[in-house]
Structures are given as structure tokens and as C-alpha cells.
Regions:
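Conserved acidic donor-binding segment of nucleotide-sugar-dependent glycosyltransferases
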Residues: 356-357, 361-368, 377-383
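Donor nucleotide-sugar binding/catalytic pocket of nucleotide-sugar-dependent glycosyltransferases
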Residues: 131, 146-224, 228-231, 239-243
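Aromatic "clamp/platform" in nucleotide-sugar-dependent glycosyltransferases that forms part
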Residues: 324
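Conserved donor-binding/catalytic core segment of Leloir-type glycosyltransferases
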Residues: 232-257, 263-266
């Protein structure tokens, strides 16, 4: 079987969750004998592994002015005329099935989906809500996407729009998907439910949770992990991951990742806990985070090494996932695989991963004070936290191995190919 993945890039120095998930899936599929390539806007790896989406050829001079026009009216992606030339590629012709991942970001024209899926069996893997909203990847508390969008309350949410044309974009997406042949894969039951409430409900929707390499993400002795990071063995250690704590567009703490809520929660810890607390940050901005929280921060910068991530997760007593929206919660799963319980919010699919009382706790509200309360409960009960640590690892190994995910995807691919025969 040959799979052609579609993503903005094949690899990147600071990889987001969707790209990390796709790369791990490709690796595990290869171990199952499945060949694959990536079709992308920016290729950073070898040509044998990835090809770039073709340009618009004779129409290339139209793309720049078309982009200016479409951006001005609030449409982000429909200027990419080269997307319609993808069927000319050898990689497309050789593929048995297409798998679309994270096709927003201005590199792919979703209006080409009907023609692309007419020629090939295709799967759409959901990493966020973008395919069925009027522009955003995370609708937060807005449910207008169920009715057609318009009057958008969050026009600056990623990917932002300069003008509210969200009803028009919603209709264009509905038109494009309505004329396409697809199977849909969702990583959480919450995402399955959301997709079924959208215009994607015309397609078969498969539940395939993300996987993790449990041989790499495995518990490291806390004393060893803390020594490696220069942390005193008797400290209370909290873990957090965010590429950068400040939103580069605004210069304030990243609200999408809940950095403002993390700051409030850690700042308000009781004195008897706070005096002995250290925060491990996988991401940029450790010094600033220390100033804002009032606790020492071990800032690791962006961590690309999975083994280094495993050390960071293992050093923590509790990992905090403060995001205001999660389609799944990949970093939570990585932490669990290392035997570290997770505290987060009841947002998206995160609660399914954490399983409150089993592998961590969910705060009672999306507030810094509620997050603080949940963290305190975890830190003050060593016996309960130790039980959760064992359960975290058991869940990761028994349900989320990469081989399990690969076999599930292979079945989706086979079912999709058979349905198109």
C-alpha cells in the first residue's frame, strides 16, 4: 500500500502537534510495510520522502493579486491555484490513498478537494476544527459552526481573518466537502461528535486516537531525571509545554495554550507548596515565566528530542495542560506514557485522555483558580498520585502504542479503498 500524506511541511525545527503525529504515524506505518510520501508546501527532508505542491504554472502571476483580493474579503486559502495541478504529480498517480492533515495555513486550496478525491480514495485526518468552521481551528465557546458561522466572535483566532466572511467560507467549505469522496479520522470521541454535528456528517467517521512511542516515552527514575535537569530531588516539580509562552502576534501570554491560566494557578499556590515548587518548561520564555509565576523555572527551550522530552516529563510530579482547546491532548499522552499524571481542563478531547481520577484530574472550570485547586489536590496526595502514575503508563502501553494506531489506520485505508472500487 502507498499513502500520500498532505501537510504544509514534511518536517520542521519547531514541530507542532499535527506534524509530530503525522511523522510518527508514517514511521509506524513503515514498520507495518506501508510506503508513504508527503506532499507539502515546504520540503525540508529528502526528495524520496516528500514532494512540493506544484505552482500555478502559467497562472502563477495571478496568485499574488488573487491572494490580496481574497485576504481582503476574509478568505485565506482559495488563491492557491497550484493545488489543482496535484494530479499531474507522479507521487499522486502512484498513491493508493491520500491522507490530508492540517490543510490550513494558506498552502492548500480546499476548493480542489472534489477533483482530487474524484481520482483517488482519500482520508481527512482531523487535528482541529478548521475543516468545518468558517475560519478558526478552535471555536472556543462558539458553536456558530453548527449553523453556518457569520458574525464571528473570534476573528483573530488562528488562522485569523482580516474581515468577517466566515459565513461565506463556511458555505464554500460545505460546497467543496459536499462534492468530495472522503473518509474522516478523528483522534477523540469529542471530535467524532463534533464532526457528526457538522457538514462532515455525510462521510464515514472513524475514531483513531493518537499513538505514542512507549519505548521512548517511558518512565525515567525521578532522581535521575531531576539530576539531569539540575533540580533538587525533594522539590515539587510541575511540567508545562508551549513552544513560546508569549503569543508572537500580541506579545502577551499565549491564551490559546492557557499560559495566562497557568501563571495564575502557579502564582496562587499555597505558600507551603510554592516554597518548594519548580516549574519545568519545554518552550521559549523561561525567565519571563519565572517572573510572572514567582517560582524557579527550568527553561529547556524548544525540545526536539523525544528522549529529552521523556526526561522532562519524568522529572515532574504533575504535568499541566492549560490549553483552552484540545482536539486530543498529545503532550498529555506523552506525559502519561512517562508515568506522570496530568491536570487540565474539560476542553475538547483532553478529558478522554486524562480520565479524571485515573490518570490525572480535570479542573472544575476553565479558570486559573480552578486549575490551582486541581494542582494542589494532586501535589498533596502522594499515594493517590503514585497510583495514577502506574495507571498512566498502563493506559499508554495498552491503548496508545504506535503499532496499534498504525493497524487502525491501515484498516481505515483499506475500507476507504474498497468503498471507492
Amino acid at each position: 500500500m502507498k499513502v500520500l500524506f498532505v501537510h504544509s511541511t514534511d518536517q520542521h525545527a519547531t514541530e507542532a502537534g499535527g506534524l509530530i503525529s503525522m511523522r510518527r504515524l508514517r514511521r509506524s506505518l513503515k514498520e507495518q510495510g506501508v510506503e508513504s510520501q508527503v506532499l507539502c508546501a515546504t520540503r525540508n527532508g529528502p526528495a524520496a520522502e516528500a514532494q512540493t505542491i506544484p505552482g500555478a504554472s502559467g497562472l502563477s502571476r495571478l496568485e499574488a493579486p488573487l491572494r490580496r483580493i481574497t485576504r481582503q474579503i476574509g478568505l485565506n486559502d482559495v488563491h492557491r491555484l497550484g493545488t489543482f495541478r496535484i494530479p499531474q504529480l507522479e507521487a499522486f498517480r502512484r498513491a493508493d490513498v491520500l491522507d490530508f492533515h492540517c490543510i490550513h495555513g494558506g498552502f492548500f486550496n480546499y476548493l480542489a478537494l472534489p477533483s482530487l478525491t474524484k481520482h483517488k480514495p482519500a482520508v481527512l485526518t482531523l487535528h482541529d476544527m478548521w475543516p468545518f468552521t468558517g475560519h478558526c481551528a478552535n471555536s472556543q465557546d462558539c458553536e456558530r459552526w453548527t449553523q453556518g458561522c457569520g458574525r464571528c466572535p473570534y476573528p483573530n483566532a488562528y488562522p485569523s481573518v482580516s474581515r468577517d466572511a466566515t459565513h461565506l467560507e463556511w458555505r464554500l467549505k460545505s460546497w467543496a466537502f459536499g462534492r468530495s469522496r472522503l473518509s474522516v479520522v478523528a483522534p477523540s470521541k469529542w471530535m467524532v461528535t463534533s464532526a457528526r454535528q457538522s457538514f462532515l456528517n455525510r462521510f464515514p467517521i472513524f475514531y483513531v486516537p493518537h499513538g505514542v512511542d512507549t519505548n521512548v516515552f517511558r518512565p525515567v527514575g525521578k532522581a535521575v531525571a531531576r539530576a539531569a535537569l539540575g533540580i533538587a530531588p525533594n522539590s515539587r516539580v510541575l511540567g508545562f509545554a508551549c513552544t513560546r509562552i508569549d503569543d508572537p502576534r500580541t506579545g502577551v501570554p499565549n491564551k490559546a495554550k492557557g499560559v495566562d491560566l497557568l501563571i495564575e494557578a502557579v502564582r496562587d499556590l499555597p505558600d507551603h507548596l510554592k516554597a518548594n515548587t519548580v516549574l519545568v518548561l519545554m518552550g521559549q520564555g523561561g525567565e519571563r515565566l519565572a517572573e510572572l509565576t514567582g517560582v524557579p523555572v527550568v527553561g529547556l527551550g524548544y525540545v526536539s528530542s523525544d528522549r529529552m522530552k521523556a526526561i522532562a516529563y519524568s522529572a515532574a510530579d504533575v504535568f499541566i495542560s492549560a490549553s483552552r482547546g484540545e482536539s486530543f491532548g498529545l503532550v498529555a499522552l506523552e506525559s502519561m506514557s512517562c508515568g506522570t499524571p496530568v491536570v487540565g481542563f474539560d476542553v475538547g478531547g483532553l478529558k478522554e485522555v486524562i480520565r479524571p481520577g485515573v490518570a490525572g484530574e480535570v479542573a472544575t472550570a476553565v479558570k486559573g483558580s480552578a486549575l490551582c485547586d486541581a494542582v494542589v489536590q494532586m501535589l498533596e496526595n502522594d499515594v493517590r498520585r503514585g497510583r495514577m502514575a502506574r495507571q498512566c503508563r498502563e493506559i499508554a502501553v495498552s491503548e496508545h502504542g504506535l503499532d496499534i494506531q498504525a493497524r487502525r489506520y491501515m484498516q481505515v485505508y483499506l475500507d476507504t479503498i474498497a468503498a471507492c472500487a
